[in-house]
C-alpha cells in the first residue's frame, strides 16, 4: 500500500510563512531603492555637468560593482550569519545613500558613493538567495523564488519610472533620502522578521586571501559540469534581453516614439512576470528540468522572427512569447540551489549573478553599437540565433548530466534514502549525506544533488518536491 502523494505547494502556503513575508517585503524596498538611487544620481550628475557621458558613467557605476561584490564579498554570506550580512549591507547602503544627499558633494564623490553602495548589493543578494531555502523547504522554495524573481522584475520596471517621478516631484536630494529610508526599513524587516541562524561555513573557510577565495569560488562553479551548465543556461538571458537594450531604436524604425518604446519594454516584463509564477505552479519539478534547454532554445528561435521585419503589434507578440519562454530561468535557479553545498552557496550565487549583470551590460553596449551599422531587428534576430545555438549545445550537456551514471558492468546506480532527511536539510542542498548507494560497487563523489539516479525511480529529493 503506497502513501498518498503530498499536496502540491501553493502561493498561499508560501505567503503563510512569516519569515518569507518579511524577506519578500525587504526585497521590494531594496530593489525600489536601488532603482531610485540610479535615477537620482544620473539626474544629479547631469544637472551638475550637463555631460551625457558623465551621466551615463554615473548610471553604469550602479552595475560595475557587481564584479567586485560577486567575486570578493558574496562569500561573506557563507562565512557570517546571513541575517547579519543582510542587515549590515542595508545599514551601510543607507549611510552611503544619505551621504549622497549632502549638498555640495563633488561629482566624483557621488559616483564613488554610488559604486560603494551598489557593491554591497551583491553580498545582500547572495545572503538572501542562500537563506531562502532554509525558510521555504522543498517545492515551496521554487514558488518563493518565482515570487521574488517577479518582484525584482516589476521593481526594475516600475522603480525606474517611480524614480523619475520622485525626482520630478520632490527633487534629487529628498529622493535620495527616501532611498536611504527604504534600506533602513529593509534592514529592520529582516532583523525583526527572520530568525537568527549560524554561519553556514566553518570558521576555517575564511582563511586565505580574497583572491584565493575568489579562485576557489570560480573552481566550484566552473569545475563541476552540472553547475557549469546551469550557470551558462542562466547567462543565456544576455542574448534574450537585447530587445530591452535597443527598444528605443527598434521602435523608432517602426515609426513609433516613446509610447512604442514603453510597449516593447512592458511586453517583455509583463510576459515574464506572468509566465514565471505559472511555470512554477503548474509544471512539476522533474518536467522543469527537462524543459530548461528546449525553452531556452525556443526563446532564441522566437526572437529570430524579428528578421522578418514585423510591425509593432506582431513584434510585441514575439517579444512576449520569447520572454514567457524565459521562465526556464526558475528551473535553473532551483537546480543550482540543490547542487551547491550550503556552505558555499552564497559565493556561488554571487559569481553567477555577477556574470549575468556584467555580460548583460556588455551585450547592451555591443547591441547598441551593432544597431548603428545594421537594423535593430537584425541585431535582435542575430542575438536570438546565437542564443538558440548555444542553448541547443547546453541542452545536450544537461542531458548528459541528467543521464544515470553506470557502474562497472553497465548497471545503473541505485540511490535509496538511508533515513528521512529533515525538511531544512532537503532544502539546503546537502541531502546527499542521507543517501547511500546500495550497490556498493562505487560511490559517487559528494555533489549535493540527487540528480543522478536510475531510470524510472524517483530520488528522495524528487519525492520532497526538489528537482
What is the predicted function of each stretch?
Residues 221, 431-467:
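Long, low-complexity, intrinsically disordered segments
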Residues 1-438, 465:
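Alpha-helical transmembrane-bundle signature of multi-pass membrane transport and export proteins
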